[in-house]
Amino acid sequence: MQFPESWLRTFVDPQLTTDELSHALTMAGLEVESLRPAAPPTEKIVVGRVLEVVKHPDADKLNVCQVDAGTGATLQIVCGAPNVAPGIKVPVALVGAKLPPAEEGGAPFAIKLSKLRGVESQGMLCSARELKLSEDHSGLMILPEGTPVGQDIREALNLDDTVFEIKLTPNKADCLSVFGIARETAAITGAPLAAPDIRPVLAELTETLPVKISAPDLCGRFSGRVIRGVNARAKTPHWMVERLERAGQRSVSALVDISNYVMFELGRPSHVFDLDKIHGGIDVRWGKRGESLKLLNGNTIELDETVGVISDGAQVESLAGIMGGDSTAVTLDTTNIYLEAAFWWPDSIRGRARKYNFSTDAAHRFERGVDYSTTVEHVERITQLILDICGGQAGPVDDQIVNLPQRAPVSMRASRANRIIGVEIGEDEIAQIFTRLGLAFERDGDVFRVTPPPHRFDIEIEEDLIEEVARIYGFEKIPARPPVAKSEMRATDETRRSVHAIRHALAARDYAETVNFSFVDAEWERDFAGNDNPVRLLNPIASQLSVMRTTLFGSLVGVLRHNLNRRAERVRVFEAGRVFVADPSVKAGELAVEGYAQPKRIGALAYGPVVEEQWGTATRQVDYFDVKGDLEALLAPVPARFVKAEHPALHPGRSARIEVDGHAVGWIGELHPRLMQKYELPHAPVMFEIDTDALVARALPAPSEVSKFPPVRRDIAVVVDQKVEVQALFDEMKKALADDACKFVQRVALFDEFRAKSNTSGGLSAHEKSLAFRVTLQDAAGTLQDETVDQAIQTLVDRMARVYGARLRG
């Protein structure tokens, strides 16, 4: 929000300097980003009147002018501007004057007594561009007729004015106008507020335009009036152009300038239609698929049922609350207009402009909420200015109210406000603060029931009112005290470890932590989760961040691509974050949203060489078993099962479902070749994703005696059908450990696999495979005898033979 200080002080004029006012606004939550002068420094530039103009004797494009600059003597100045003429008043740079430098950082341009083609020139007549007031260099800057000759140009044009630029938070829509800032300034400083002088215009016509509001959920109130006989070619007054330019808005034409001026003044966007281009009445409705509209910016957009429009009997005329259409735009030939000011529901405007990749001042205001009680007053204000500047005759205001917000009172407890703010603020002082803010309230003990005014869409809950009390009371008045808390020794739950410890464990295994958005591209959800119906955002910050993620895989691959594009050769990253899944069984709670599960997961990705390139080890790409080892180390001492299964994002033959205590807790595997090709990856990364709960839970450490006796190791090779999974054999051997004969078995590990090849069978048929296991046995009480070991091995083999038809390989 940008505005000149002089405009603000027409509404409220606190006894503060510019810097003090800036500080007061910033400390109340209206952050002043910058203060800059309305014009660069100048010296000895005054108002002059051109008395006479004659052609230069030796140059066709130059004129010799006689100028009265209030110095007591007529000055002769050579000028080449095409619009120089006797009688006009212009800025005159006297000899010795200093103009702003041509380039930023350069030296000021000094005016000297000089000769141009043999004719002496005693100064220079200036354009607005030469004074750095605008980019207009078409000719001299013509000043209003009433400007006193000889007056310093800085005084005449108020060039010592200061332009404020304020960075507003999204909730402060009520401050998107000069009057809104003035209202806040009055509340902050206690200075009196002068409301705009808005008087109803006498209706000289009886004509109204038929208006139908077909979508009350789009438009709650629509006010308008017909004005005939306007002069669209009228010149916008200098004071209005000056205020608009200092607010960052260039002058277009009188009708457009007036509409923009009132928007900056009062915060109400409005629209002026060319009445003669409207076919019949107008209808405020939702758009229809297949309709199109050419906008004022020249773009033609395709409409659908999610955007609001204003249409007539023949065509769509305007994109409701965002931008007018080209077909009914006013021009310099317009004589009859229809003026409109409406209340558009914020939800019906929010995000619609971004949908078409542009933004407007109107959409910026309406999507945040604009006062719904003042549409008629603002129509009167615009009408007043149009009749004063462009002339014409106005009809009556047609005000249609169909659906306005019902603002329920918001309660605030003074005791809670004091507890949150941290200082004792008396109830009478709180009442005074609410009064200064224009918040109507009722008191019941220490409870204030505040009815939010129509211009405050940000007041909905108790904390909103506490914020208002704090910022008007003054954050600077709140003493800075260090927090005091009693130290308390809490018992440590040894059955759980923190997510912080897990992150440290991953970092110790050479993974770097990354943090990504929880909202992702819808295409990622299809690719990495097989999800065609993700949780969609109503108001995404970008089109490629439109859905909530249900897996971390997409985010990790995105980080991988980002690093590969920067020539990284080895990438190992992890993320601890939430995913969002639609689940009707979830009930609303303090940390839960009804209908949506938000489990926390940990995902990791490894890509490139297992270790950094070195002379002592051959380079090898990371594989499934490397990452599986990292995951097992992370889960230890909890054992995990890895069950062959398919996942949309993973290689069908190199992926597994992770199970702990019989429950599926995650996935591990190599990226699917289809996705590797789609995302242009030279090698397939290996990834895992696991529920955080499975990692934080752990059994209490159980001490066991270290055996003094040597372990016994036996290798066995069993032949099974190729369809039998290794994990299934491990599961059966684990069950066998419950047998008394296997009580000394400490560990079983697979160390070899053999399958028949074309040139050698190894005694196996084509559908068989040989698996070699190393069984480690140990007794803490004594050395194991061969009979005990043989019995344990035979029990394991018998178990596999009975269930899967396994046989010892000869």
From Swiss-Prot:
Note on cofactor: Binds 2 magnesium ions per tetramer.
Cofactors (names): Mg(2+)
GO cellular component terms attached to this protein's record: phenylalanine-tRNA ligase complex
Keyword RNA-binding: yes
GO molecular-function term, one example from the UniProt record: tRNA binding
Biological process, per Gene Ontology: phenylalanyl-tRNA aminoacylation
Pfam families hit by this protein: B3_4 (PF03483), B5 (PF03484), FDX-ACB (PF03147), tRNA_bind (PF01588), tRNA_synthFbeta (PF17759)
Primary enzyme class: ligase
Subcellular location, record wording: Cytoplasm
tRNA-binding as UniProt keyword: yes
Domain FDX-ACB: from-to ranges: 707-809
Domain B5: 405-480
EC number(s) per entry: 6.1.1.20
Coarse class of the protein's main subcellular location: cytoplasm
CDD domains the record matches: PheRS_beta_core (cd00769), tRNA_bind_bactPheRS (cd02796)
Keywords on record: Aminoacyl-tRNA synthetase, ATP-binding, Cytoplasm, Ligase, Magnesium, Metal-binding, Nucleotide-binding, Protein biosynthesis, RNA-binding, tRNA-binding
Domain tRNA-binding: 39-154
Catalyzed chemical reaction(s): tRNA(Phe) + L-phenylalanine + ATP = L-phenylalanyl-tRNA(Phe) + AMP + diphosphate + H(+)
HAMAP family: Phe_tRNA_synth_beta1
Family: Belongs to the phenylalanyl-tRNA synthetase beta subunit family. Type 1 subfamily.
PANTHER family, A to Z: PHENYLALANINE--TRNA LIGASE BETA SUBUNIT, PHENYLALANYL-TRNA SYNTHETASE BETA CHAIN AND LEUCINE-RICH REPEAT-CONTAINING PROTEIN 47
Subunit structure: Tetramer of two alpha and two beta subunits.
NCBIfam families recorded: pheT_bact (TIGR00472), YtpR (NF045760)
Protein name, per record: Phenylalanine--tRNA ligase beta subunit
Species per Swiss-Prot/TrEMBL record: Burkholderia pseudomallei (strain 1710b)
Gene: pheT
